[in-house]
Amino acid sequence: MIIYLHGFDSNSPGNHEKVLQLQFIDSDVRFINYSTLHPKHDMQHLLKEVHKAIEQSGDPNPLICGVGLGGYWSERIGFLCGIKQVIFNPNLHPELTMQGRIDRPEEYEDISTKCVEKFRAKNQGRCLVILSRQDEIHDNQKTAQELQDYYDIVWDDTQTHKFKKISHHLQAMKAFKAA
């Protein structure tokens, strides 16, 4: 089973396309929707829904993945639920990048203070990071510097922030999921 979390643009037709692409490596792909506007509520909702999906699935190696803000949530929720994660162009600091876009971006900061201390060290090797060199939203060199001590990083030379085409990375995802 693969759980897919969308980014900030939850209505993008690209989300459906990514789900279809993921079905090439696992027929059981679950799209979990969340508001993107209420971080504390989103975290509670995602924890509940991901936990429920894991319980319903017979997959011994479930995986959670997401793009942008979905990458932020995939890393945290995947860690808390004990499943591997694949994150594309993750928004590592929504408390900064979401200012002016949502009412309470400071809730992300509150979430990070309540998260397990040094969770990345405890999550080491359980997350695959795929970064685009053409990301027009985030500086992925900084993202790589922040994550490289904990996770393997794969660079993509053609995709933009929304990562429309994940197909080039499906086999790496499949191998990571099975490992």
Swiss-Prot record:
InterPro entries for this protein: AB_hydrolase_fold, UPF0227, UPF0227/Esterase_YqiA
An example Gene Ontology molecular-function term: hydrolase activity, acting on ester bonds
Gene Ontology CC annotation, any one: cytosol
Superkingdom of origin: Bacteria
One Pfam family per UniProt: UPF0227
Record-linked NCBIfam families: PRK04940.1
Family: Belongs to the UPF0227 family.
Protein name: UPF0227 protein VC_1892
Upper classification of the organism: Bacteria, Pseudomonadati, Pseudomonadota, Gammaproteobacteria, Vibrionales
